């Protein structure tokens, strides 16, 4: 019902994304983005990056990405910290390192606050705001590319859920 009503009300896309991820938003739907199994935090972070940033980070949950040097495990774990209530431990080949990665956004933006919220709900609210921030270089590109593909048959970059700085636009 939430998504249907949001479209019916002509709700802005960035507002819908904020409502989807931020538990403090007035129309917050069920938090289906956050999965319930033991790897919920890493899957939630990877899924959010893929859907809203066109960035596949699943590999970086366990190791540095093999063919995309842009995504290190450390960078992914910093992003995933927003889906937890604490900084996450860096795990190497399933071995604990006792090294915790500070929570941080995946892109440098002038508007990123330097403090990190302490509770999971506050962190979810922060990641929602960072995703839709006008200074975020990927958010608008991602939805435009998805719509371009939907209506014109091919995205400006392909595949639509794996934008890479080292891959030129398809046309």
Q: Would you name each region that the model predicts?
A:
Residues 1-114, 121-129, 133-171:
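Short, structured secondary-structure elements
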């Amino acid at each position: 019902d939430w998504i249907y009503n949001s479209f019916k009300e002509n709700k802005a896309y960035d507002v819908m994304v904020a409502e989807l991820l931020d538990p403090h938003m007035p129309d917050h739907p069920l938090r289906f983005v956050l999965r319930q199994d033991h790897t919920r935090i890493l899957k939630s972070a990877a899924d959010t990056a893929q859907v809203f940033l066109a960035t596949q980070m699943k590999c970086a949950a366990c190791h540095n990405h093999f063919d995309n040097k842009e995504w290190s495990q450390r960078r992914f774990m910093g992003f995933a910290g927003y889906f937890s209530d604490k900084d996450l431990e860096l795990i190497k080949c399933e071995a604990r390192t006792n090294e915790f990665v500070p929570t941080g956004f995946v892109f440098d933006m002038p508007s990123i606050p330097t403090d990190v919220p302490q509770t999971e709900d506050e962190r979810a609210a922060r990641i929602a705001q960072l995703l839709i921030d006008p200074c975020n270089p990927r958010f608008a590109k991602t939805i435009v590319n998805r719509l371009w593909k939907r209506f014109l048959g091919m995205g400006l970059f392909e595949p639509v859920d794996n934008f890479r700085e080292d891959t030129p636009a398809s046309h």
